């Protein structure tokens, strides 16, 4: 048995198209259903919960420590690519001179803290008034992003300034670009990636990721290696 509890909820009804990339040369659009992500506060039957995006591949147990902490809420405050370079500016701040990005890829929270409910209420409020906050904070695009919602909620709860009310998970999140690809799955906890050069798209670098957690942004790369991944899990 893989799960003790399964909660099934209807997807948010808002239209939210996202352009995805599978290498620098091919793009496609699909529905991006993330409008009810903040509702995990009411969905979870547990006091302590670690919410993970479905494309966040866990190759170690390095986040277990959060369950022994006294933090109300924690997320990644920094991200880097597969070769440990900082993410491009649009992934570091909401706009050129905007507030720092906080990532909703992994969200730890403890419902027993008063601040936790307040955080999720502010997250919902920002989502309900997304166009207003887009104008106020000057972030680009038309797609609804929960990263923007939690970043703004963090900013508001810190008195419209920098602060640590929303804790950092302590290390940068490793983030795979949609221009990157999975080259080979050696085992459950050892993957080889091709890392596309940001300036010279014809050039790739191989990167070995071993026993580290990775946000796999190129969804079709996961699909291409599905059988190998499932076989490794079964093996």
Feature locations, PLM:
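Short, P/G- and charge-enriched loop/turn segments at secondary-structure junctions
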Residues: 26-28, 90-97
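Conserved beta-strand termini and adjacent loop/short-helix elements that scaffold enzyme active sites
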Residues: 8-11, 76, 165-168
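A glycosyltransferase accessory/donor-loop signature
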Residues: 16, 96-235
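Active-site-proximal specificity loops/subdomain of glycosyltransferases
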Residues: 2-44
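GT-A fold catalytic core of metal-dependent nucleotide-sugar glycosyltransferases
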Residues: 8, 33-85
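Short glycine-/acidic-enriched loop or helix-start segments at secondary-structure transitions
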Residues: 18, 60-63, 118-119
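Short, polar loop motifs at secondary-structure junctions
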Residues: 1, 11-12, 57-60, 169
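Residue-level detector of flexible, active-site-proximal loop/helix-junction positions
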Residues: 12-15, 80-82, 113
